[in-house]
Swiss-Prot record:
E1 activity is regulated by phosphorylation (inactivation) and dephosphorylation (activation) of the alpha subunit. It catalyses: N(6)-[(R)-lipoyl]-L-lysyl-[protein] + pyruvate + H(+) = N(6)-[(R)-S(8)-acetyldihydrolipoyl]-L-lysyl-[protein] + CO2. The lineage of its organism: Eukaryota, Viridiplantae, Streptophyta, Embryophyta, Tracheophyta. This is Pyruvate dehydrogenase E1 component subunit alpha-1, mitochondrial. Expressed in roots, rosettes and flowers. Mg(2+) binds at D196, N225, Y227. Residues 1-32 form a transit peptide.
Amino acid sequence: MALSRLSSRSNIITRPFSAAFSRLISTDTTPITIETSLPFTAHLCDPPSRSVESSSQELLDFFRTMALMRRMEIAADSLYKAKLIRGFCHLYDGQEAVAIGMEAAITKKDAIITAYRDHCIFLGRGGSLHEVFSELMGRQAGCSKGKGGSMHFYKKESSFYGGHGIVGAQVPLGCGIAFAQKYNKEEAVTFALYGDGAANQGQLFEALNISALWDLPAILVCENNHYGMGTAEWRAAKSPSYYKRGDYVPGLKVDGMDAFAVKQACKFAKQHALEKGPIILEMDTYRYHGHSMSDPGSTYRTRDEISGVRQERDPIERIKKLVLSHDLATEKELKDMEKEIRKEVDDAIAKAKDCPMPEPSELFTNVYVKGFGTESFGPDRKEVKASLP
């Protein structure tokens, strides 16, 4: 049967389909109820329902967006190996359900701040493939003007505050954003994402304490992919139940490979944070690549373990099965969609390669508050003299 047509969303990564995919086969707007793969495990709160309201449009949108994220990260791997991406590069393949599920539960008024595994979060916030690949290759059209690279994506107009390279340091910044939201009486929350490797950082507990003390709308999200830079969680944490780490702060453990479980948990957490203050979400997820491109990812875990997760828990395959079981598309139509996605990614890479490098003067922008930078120092300032022609 023909593929249902996706409605346009505020998220610009949803592209119009070719004519073959634009045939509207149903005007049925009846909600689809989907059961989460696993029950939620709660700490100091009642868990949300496992029944999640969705629609045919959302299911198809989830599949396409997650497939796009996966293809983008695989392409980044190839570009890095071809030395077109320099410096650090941390890939997100395997964890796409967290990005897409979280985005489905919130609005662009809600803020997100994360660590260095940030490409897919940026895409979910409305960033474009062209911005992604331009930034990765240090080009002028990048989301951070080619200066940030893989670890420092940013999109202020969509309340995405990075992209941070210091382990755990984004969490107190996120709580600061939540403080501003409460101070300004905004009906919005902040999601501060961190990994299991950052969960033992002292600043995380300090930020959580002040957030609880002041009832800030802060949601701390531990993306537990079970390995730090090469250290299994059991070797670094006496208590790996990260959703309980707040002690006096409620928490929820979520199947982070199930986009609908993530959506339901984030929706629940947002309501809680607006009414009662901070909450911790632990997303039980998995990364397929190593910690970074310099890590093969197979010295501290077996290849059988990785392939086992791919076969049994892959987040995209889970959505694909739901699409097929609800007769929203055929196998062939989904494969054709994936071909379109590959072309879209290839076109974005080609466009980014043609983009010029930043001007040397760009080194001095976004360093100081506007009005207090090099433009106010005069021609004798040493920073200005150091600027390359």
